Amino acid sequence: MAKPIVAIVGRPNVGKSTLFNKLAGKRISIVQDTPGVTRDRIYAEAEWLNYKFTMIDTGGIEPKSEDIIVSQMRRQAQIAIEMANVIIFLVDGKEGLAPADKEVAQMLRKSKKPVVLVVNKIDKLKDENNAYEFYNLGIGDPVTISSSQALGLGDMLDRVVEYFKDDESAGEDDERINIAFIGKPNVGKSSLINKLLGEERLIVSDIPGTTRDSIDSYVDTDFGEFTLIDTAGLRRKSKVKEEIERYSVIRTYASIERADVCILMIDATEGISEQDQKIIGYAHDINKAILVIVNKWDLVEKDDKTMDKFKKELKVNLSFMPYAKYLFISAKTGQRVVKVLQTAKECYDNYNKRVKTGVLNDVISQAIMMKEPPIVGTKRLKIYYVTQIGTKPPTFIFFVNDPACIHFSYQRYLENQLRENFDFQGTGIKSEFRERKEK
């Protein structure tokens, strides 16, 4: 089940990125600088009043003419409208109501999506009167903030999460397995999906996806019901290349959010890129099941060692997710295509796997006997018992004498024991250590 998406929308220079970065610095946990982290921080995980959601900074493009302002603003707003559950409509309280604000407001009213109107740059109490003219937008009561001074952000977020409570669909689980096909343009995502649809011959329907330029295809098989999310699109180059790349990334991230399993497709003739590492790293960071597919394998000159060598190089570049499954195919010739959905289903089953508490503790007891916990300072870690508290991904809590005694190497050892005994290939696992006083 995907978390709600909150998009910050508005014309250029109203302070969208400043607001996003302020929230990121205050409330959003950004993982350390690894290939799994997007440095531009277009997307970030957020939590307020125990509601978890994903925040998007739609950014603002500096235009060269008034016409470009309007067209780029419209594109930005439309993308955000399509993917968001709640929209923060940001306006500039110092500059006042602008014609472009009215055009954005008109789009938002037509969307019938929940909108929180936020008047930014209200740095002083006396400036609050500047907000009154924005009632003319017909979007509702404005919230006044100063993103630069972090004033009013709590009131704004209170309004945002109120809409989550009204969203009954947020609590519904879809029985279908959502699979996002991600990767660079022309790597063969659409070709593979078309091949899968042609071979399965059980397509329910093709419907426009929730993110622009993506298509959701429904496929039923003997072993599962799947939604295939094609993130292909925007393949042609443009004069505004940076803008298009930015929106392409936003759409891909939205598809990852919706997915249970993320399939990273790599061109066998090109190998893996930094862009590939970043995009699949995001899926890893938010704990999705992962399958890496090397496409166009028919174009590679090979011997009996080529595949192992290629996979070894991939594992070095994707060392932050050693659990990933790999598959070498040719969407063009159909080589191993029949294994794609089967392997994705295996990843999903492991992603959704539960282990009985008794069996779990037997394995951990054996692991402790084979390798005793290290002494940290003057204290040795004692593990009393372990239990699984969740799936997607499998999440375990270890009750111990002192969580400070757990060394990362021993935590990795315990997780590896879980992997070896319960086959968690294709999914990350999470472990947490909590103190329990010895009786």
Curated annotation (Swiss-Prot):
Name of the protein this chain belongs to: GTPase Der
SMART domains: AAA
Binding site for GTP 1: 10-17, 57-61, 120-123
Organism: Clostridium botulinum (strain Hall / ATCC 3502 / NCTC 13319 / Type A)
Residues that, per the record, bind GTP 2: 183-190, 230-234, 295-298
SUPFAM superfamilies: P-loop containing nucleoside triphosphate hydrolases
InterPro entries for the chain: AAA+_ATPase (IPR003593), G_ENGA (IPR031166), GTP-bd (IPR006073), GTPase_Der (IPR016484), KH_dom-like (IPR032859), KH_dom-like_a/b (IPR015946), P-loop_NTPase (IPR027417), Small_GTP-bd (IPR005225)
Family listed: Belongs to the TRAFAC class TrmE-Era-EngA-EngB-Septin-like GTPase superfamily. EngA (Der) GTPase family.
